[in-house]
Curated annotation (Swiss-Prot):
Pfam families: DegV. Hexadecanoate binds at T61, S94. Keywords: Lipid-binding. It comes from Streptococcus pyogenes serotype M1. May bind long-chain fatty acids, such as palmitate, and may play a role in lipid transport or fatty acid metabolism. Residues 3-280 form the DegV domain. This is DegV domain-containing protein SPy_0865/M5005_Spy0672. It comes from the Bacteria.
Length: 282
């Protein structure tokens, strides 16, 4: 079995995997004032925040190119790849996952699977890493898919944002529109639910209380198993440091990896968002 893993630019990959020849990534466009950008090509994350601050309109994103994925699958076939797993941004907040399922019929020479990751960022990158590791350990394709589904089912993220406008106006928050007029008195905690949608999980009165509540939620989640924990933020270093300190003060003794949301996810969360992601160690 020669396996390739395809993902998208919302996945935060471990440094040692960024040049791995078995990993392929599709760019997701970010549109600001009718100009199209691709992070890492013609847009740095610092430039993104500056352009977002300067613009009168909220940025938008589009889906990766279907034709690019179709062409990539043809290229992989010509290079002798026999199996492909595609792991992309949660189907609950992007239509891309639903739109690509037909491609398996277009490339019958490759055995492929596109499971819904139901997540993004560092937990998505962790899934990509695990799939490659399992493949190189000699696991069968079906065994990899079974184990991957176990990881997907055990993965989630909880988020606190400064401004719900990005999520609601972008159509990425399933049950948040009623909160827009009430943000002065609450600080909503959001989560990725079982369908990969971002939903309001709980309403807390202040940011400080919300941060403490995030720690309580995290400790409850990881009490019954072994998990990798990520603190993820969009230009909110002070909040990330504070959340990490609260975690350590609560007795958490394991490594905590800190990463930044890329431009695509920061488009929907806005500047100042803080989150934690958890994914099981398998």
């Amino acid at each position: 079995m020669k396996l390739a893993v395809i993902t998208d630019s919302t996945a935060t990959l471990p440094t040692d995997l960024k040049q791995d020849k078995a990993i392929f990534s599709l760019d997701i466009p970010v549109i600001i004032d009718d100009e199209t950008y691709f992070e890492g090509r013609n847009l740095s994350i610092d430039d993104f925040y500056q352009k977002m601050a300067d613009s009168q309109n909220l940025p938008k994103t589009s889906q990766p190119s279907l034709s690019e994925l179709d062409n990539l699958l043809g290229l992989l076939s010509s290079k002798g790849y026999t199996h492909v797993i595609g792991l992309f941004l949660a189907g609950g907040i992007s239509g891309f996952w639903q739109n690509i399922q037909f491609l398996a019929e277009e490339h019958p020479e490759i055995e492929m699977a596109f499971p819904d990751s139901k997540i993004t960022s560092a937990p998505l990158g962790s899934m990509v890493k695990n799939v490659l590791d399992w493949s190189r350990q000699g696991m069968t394709f079906q065994a990899i898919l079974n184990k991957l589904q176990e990881q997907i089912d055990g993965t989630t993220a909880f988020i606190m944002v400064d401004d719900l406008n990005h999520l609601v106006k972008g159509g990425r928050l399933s049950n948040g529109s009623a909160l827009l007029g009430n943000l002065l008195s609450i600080k909503p905690i959001l989560r990725f639910d079982e369908e990969g949608k971002i939903v309001v999980y709980e309403k807390v009165r202040t940011e400080k209380k919300a941060m403490k509540r995030l720690v309580e939620i995290l400790n409850d989640l990881i009490a019954d198993g072994q998990y990798n924990v990520f603190i993820i933020h969009s230009k909110a270093q002070d909040k990330a440091d504070y959340l990490k300190r609260l975690l350590q003060d609560s007795g958490y003794q394991y490594d905590i990896e800190e990463v930044h949301f890329g431009a695509v996810i920061a488009t929907h969360l806005g500047e100042g968002a803080i989150a934690f992601g958890v994914t099981p160690r398998l």
